[in-house]
């Protein structure tokens, strides 16, 4: 089982330089854990691509369908008071935005407060650094401009 943040899920939905590596990683362990808002965050990134003309309406429909298939199989960590407390702490000790702190807090909750027992997959350097400092083994995906998968 691995925790995937939104930046790591995106290469599974759109073609990026890291898509093959991300797909190999998910094939090696299909047990995916994500934060509750991951699907929304990914849909937002896809909408930015469509608005920026990097995607056609057809590309968008294909990507959203792919995202929905992934979402039907993953396990989501839902919002809780404990998760919020962790996120508040994380924004104070790491240079994270609120959404990234929620991602990392969700991973900590998923790991039952034992980060060394859960891999954290991300394409976000700042989030990766914070995750390492919190004790996670991080799988870093380097990304370039996305294109339709």
Each language-model region and where it sits:
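Short, well-structured N-terminal submotif of metal-dependent ribonuclease cores
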Residues: 1-38, 49-62, 136, 146-149
């Amino acid at each position: 089982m691995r925790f995937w943040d939104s930046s790591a899920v995106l290469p599974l939905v759109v073609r990026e330089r890291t898509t093959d590596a991300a797909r190999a990683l998910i094939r090696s362990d299909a047990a995916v854990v994500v934060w509750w808002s991951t699907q929304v965050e990914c849909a937002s990134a896809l909408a930015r691509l469509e608005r920026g003309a990097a995607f056609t309406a057809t590309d968008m429909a294909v990507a959203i369908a792919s995202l929905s298939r992934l979402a039907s199989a993953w396990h989501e960590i839902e919002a809780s008071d404990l998760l919020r407390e962790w996120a508040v702490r994380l924004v104070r000790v790491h240079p994270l935005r609120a959404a990234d702190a929620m991602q990392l807090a969700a991973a900590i909750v998923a790991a039952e407060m034992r980060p060394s027992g859960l891999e954290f997959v991300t394409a976000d350097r700042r989030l990766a650094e914070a995750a390492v400092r919190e004790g996670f083994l991080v799988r870093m995906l380097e990304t370039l401009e996305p294109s339709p998968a």
